[in-house]
């Protein structure tokens, strides 16, 4: 293979992934104390450092430029691939107790301590369903107070079309130029510093934090450099050991509806999941949660709040919001909007912008600016309606049981009286896809029957390539190429639907879109769901068509 500059990113990606595989499969790395007592192991990694330096791949990206595309390529090299994820799962160890210690160390290496992040006046939000929507609502409300809060940061995940969506200021993704600038400032600081291998055996020279951890560090750096006056942070997974939990003094914490998800990492009961979510609670920072939480989960959340010496308050749905058209559709969003009202109220009161906090009562009076903020909230891929040509697309990236029921119910109620043809476009590559389809089917039936059902992969283009921002290494490439999940979904659908709908399989989202355009001369209602990756890929395909 010719090793030119263009091959460096691929070279370093391959090297790091194989190195990670060694680490993940080596028992001693799960136990730092064994590292200290094993001279051979330590010598091995000193030698690896030597190879890093000798091969000049410690930071080859300095040699190929620092554009946005370079940043995305480098960022994608930090993803855990499917084999590594499976290796971790096989160990049965859910907890990486080093996560937060490592986050503190990574932060030190880029020039910050956790206390530096306190100046961001953070709202910290966790939950299973609706935490992204709640974060968006909260950010939009705060954005109505521009004179007092000229810059509001928003950190969410995952993204739909562009990784820049994860780091927003005043509701807008940061520019490609700023993303690249701040990305390489963090990247280069990590390259120019080292950590003690006695304390942090995983942090060998040349290594970087994983994809989400790196973005979390990048968000802190960006928001501080941009002088954001308040920031809204959505937890990645769980709370207790999430990399965002390096936040020491949030102003307020929120918990959206709990459900069963990410069971490998969080546990497979509501109690275990609630315990993890409650890990973001901090002394002195009041916590709020939506009403109608599962009773067992609510009990644990209350215990966690008491543990952390703070208060937990259930937020009712405000009556004043009953007739408000929220910027994010779906009746279930009313509870998320109500939670956002209380979170924003705490920030604004603490900042001496609101004289009095909003009362946590269903009859409370909500300021007009709050209402405008809720109405103006924009959040693609969640109960989104798009008219494209003759067809109407109903798009929601639901990928858990509860969110699938909510999204399917929204679609059913919205198109119940429509006489158009009905088409389903679905994929879920890493969870129990058939179970989600069953949830969908039972939620729309018998009122809605689909004429055509299309199961696709999350591959963006019919050439077999992905949009660079949508590259994902955490699914089995073999399963994608052989359409294993999609063929299984067809069998399951035909069984539950008694072969009424015509089923199709496509190898890419672009092909699925082309198929839909040719199915009928008459208009159709198209429900797209199952995966945020699917939704993001479809929106990217739409963008290219619109440009043409």
Curated annotation (Swiss-Prot):
It is an enzyme of class 6 (ligase). A monovalent cation. Belongs to the folylpolyglutamate synthase family. Its EC number is 6.3.2.17. The keyword DNA-binding does not apply. ATP binds at residues 130-133, 382, 396. The keyword Hydrolase does not apply. Mg(2+) 2 binds at residue 262. GO terms for biological process: one-carbon metabolic process. Pathway: Cofactor biosynthesis; tetrahydrofolylpolyglutamate biosynthesis. Its cofactor is a monovalent cation. GO terms for cellular component: cytosol; mitochondrial inner membrane; mitochondrial matrix. Catalyzes conversion of folates to polyglutamate derivatives allowing concentration of folate compounds in the cell and the intracellular retention of these cofactors, which are important substrates for most of the folate-dependent enzymes that are involved in one-carbon transfer reactions involved in purine, pyrimidine and amino acid synthesis. Required for methionine synthesis and maintenance of intact mitochondrial DNA. Involved in telomere maintenance. Mg(2+) 1 binds at residues 157, 234. Keywords: ATP-binding, Cytoplasm, Ligase, Magnesium, Membrane, Metal-binding, Mitochondrion, Mitochondrion inner membrane, Nucleotide-binding, One-carbon metabolism. This is Folylpolyglutamate synthase. GO terms for molecular function: ATP binding; metal ion binding; tetrahydrofolylpolyglutamate synthase activity. SUPFAM superfamilies: MurD-like peptide ligases, catalytic domain, MurD-like peptide ligases, peptide-binding domain. It comes from Saccharomyces cerevisiae (strain FostersO). It is found in: Mitochondrion inner membrane; Mitochondrion matrix; Cytoplasm. The lineage of its organism: Eukaryota, Fungi, Dikarya, Ascomycota, Saccharomycotina. It catalyses: (6S)-5,6,7,8-tetrahydrofolyl-(gamma-L-Glu)(n) + L-glutamate + ATP = (6S)-5,6,7,8-tetrahydrofolyl-(gamma-L-Glu)(n+1) + ADP + phosphate + H(+).
């Amino acid at each position: 293979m010719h090793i030119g500059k263009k091959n460096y990113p691929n070279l370093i990606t391959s090297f790091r992934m194989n190195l990670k595989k060694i680490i993940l499969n080596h028992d001693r790395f799960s136990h730092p104390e064994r590292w200290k007592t094993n001279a051979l192991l330590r010598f091995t990694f000193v030698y690896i450092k030597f190879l890093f330096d000798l091969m000049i791949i410690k930071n080859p990206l300095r040699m190929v430029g620092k554009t946005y595309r370079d940043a995305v390529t480098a960022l994608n090299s930090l993803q855990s691939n499917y084999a590594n994820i499976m290796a971790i799962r096989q160990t049965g160890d859910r907890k990486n107790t080093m996560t937060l210690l490592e986050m503190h160390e990574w932060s030190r290496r880029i020039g910050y301590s956790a206390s530096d992040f306190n100046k961001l006046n953070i709202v910290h939000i966790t939950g299973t369903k609706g935490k992204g929507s709640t974060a968006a609502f909260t950010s939009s409300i705060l954005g109505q107070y521009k004179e007092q809060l000229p810059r509001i940061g928003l950190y969410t995940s995952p993204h739909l079309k562009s990784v820049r969506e994860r780091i927003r200021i005043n509701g807008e993704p940061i520019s490609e130029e700023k993303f690249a600038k701040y990305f390489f400032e963090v990247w280069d600081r990590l390259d120019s510093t080292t950590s003690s291998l006695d304390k942090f055996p995983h942090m060998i020279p040349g290594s970087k934090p994983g994809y989400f951890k790196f973005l979390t560090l990048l968000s802190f750096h960006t928001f501080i450099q941009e002088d954001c006056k308040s920031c809204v942070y959505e937890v990645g997974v769980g709370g207790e050991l999430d990399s965002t939990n390096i936040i020491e003094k949030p102003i307020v914490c929120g918990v959206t509806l709990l459900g069963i998800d990410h069971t490998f990492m969080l546990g497979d009961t509501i109690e275990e999941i609630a315990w993890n979510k409650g890990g973001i609670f901090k002394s002195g920072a009041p916590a709020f949660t939506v009403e109608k939480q599962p009773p067992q989960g609510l009990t644990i959340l209350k215990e966690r709040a008491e543990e952390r010496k703070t208060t937990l308050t259930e937020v009712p749905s405000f009556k004043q919001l009953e007739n408000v058209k929220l910027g994010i559709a779906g009746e279930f969003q009313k509870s998320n909007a109500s939670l956002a009202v209380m979170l924003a109220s705490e920030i604004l009161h603490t900042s001496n912008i609101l004289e009095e906090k909003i009362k946590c009562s269903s009859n409370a009076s909500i300021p007009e600016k709050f209402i405008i903020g809720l109405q103006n909230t924009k959040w693609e891929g969640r109960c989104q309606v798009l008219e494209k040509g003759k067809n109407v697309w109903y798009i929601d990236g639901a990928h858990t049981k509860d969110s699938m029921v909510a999204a399917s119910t929204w679609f059913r109620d919205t198109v119940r009286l429509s006489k158009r043809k009905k088409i389903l476009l679905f994929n879920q590559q890493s969870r129990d896809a058939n179970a989600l389809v069953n949830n969908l089917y039972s939620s729309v039936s018998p009122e809605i029957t689909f004429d055509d059902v299309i199961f696709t992969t999350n591959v963006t283009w019919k050439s077999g390539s992905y949009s660079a921002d949508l590259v994902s290494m955490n699914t089995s490439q073999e399963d994608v190429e052989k359409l294993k999940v999609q063929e299984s979904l067809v069998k399951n659908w035909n069984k539950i639907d008694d072969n009424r709908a015509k089923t199709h399989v496509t190898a890419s989202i672009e092909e699925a879109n082309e198929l839909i355009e040719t199915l009928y001369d008459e208009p159709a209602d198209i429900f797209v769901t199952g995966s945020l990756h699917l939704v993001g890929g479809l929106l990217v395909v739409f963008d290219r068509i619109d440009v043409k």
